[in-house]
Amino acid sequence: TCVCGSDLWTYRNPNIKEGRLNSGHEAIGIVEETGDAITTVKPGDFVIAPFTHGCGECDACYAGFDGTCDRHLGNSNWSHGVQAEYIRFHCANWSLIKIPGQPSDYTEAMLKSLLSLADVMPTGYHAARVAHVKPGDKVVVIGDGAVGQCAVIAAKMCGASQIVLMSRYKDRQEMALASGATAVVEERGEEGIAKVREILGGGADAALECVGTEAAIDQALGVLHNGGRMGFVGVPHYNNRA
């Protein structure tokens, strides 16, 4: 498993006592036991355990939004506590993804890449998907963390002709440029919007918001031309979530 930025919110929360719960919501591992209804995986299988538990049968899952599965258990459909020796995974028939072979068949780098498919890469791809990024589109990615980096990769996979990353960190800029970004904008606010529009020769066809702040959402809306599309995957951390 790995540490997501959202795990740190819980870790740093003074209202949560130490030892009360495990962090983590994305993992790869070996199936130890299965329930009677499970037919798609068996003990010994190497699998990706994603951060959502879609049933694969409801309207939300059929529409490709398993994160809001109509049949989810508990208050949310996110995994919790996977930084543990064993975890219980609901809706395994549809949600667990079998990986060919065993962990020993892969290098450490390949295992880390597979782990990214449990959350961060699908989240970045989901931003591009819901924004309907298509070949030739001009795309802006707001957020240069792991999800933003994966959104850059996803936009390139979808055939975007220009990909502008809004970032202030040199190492993250270099990573994104190596992954397919065509330009970087460090400015924010109206200055940043003007810079993006200058680079693209107008507004963007799609904006992929990967931060979750009001400022980031305003930035995403500001860089779009009329009729542009926004993929919003940043976890909201502000009061107004309408």
What are these regions (language model features)?
Residues T1, R12-D59, P100-T107:
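Glycine-rich beta-strand-centered segment in the early N-terminal region that forms part
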Residues S6-R12:
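Cytochrome P450 core scaffold surrounding the K-helix E-X-X-R motif
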Residues F46, K138, G228-R229:
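Short glycine-centered segments of the SAM/dcSAM-binding site in methyltransferase folds
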Residues C55-I142:
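NAD(P)H dinucleotide-binding glycine-rich loop of Rossmann-like/cofactor-binding domains
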Residues A127, A151-A154:
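Hydrophobic residues within alpha-helices
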Residues V141-D144, Q149, K156-Q219:
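Adenosine-nucleotide cofactor-binding segment
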Residues A160, V211-A242:
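Glycine-rich phosphate-binding loop and adjacent beta-alpha segment
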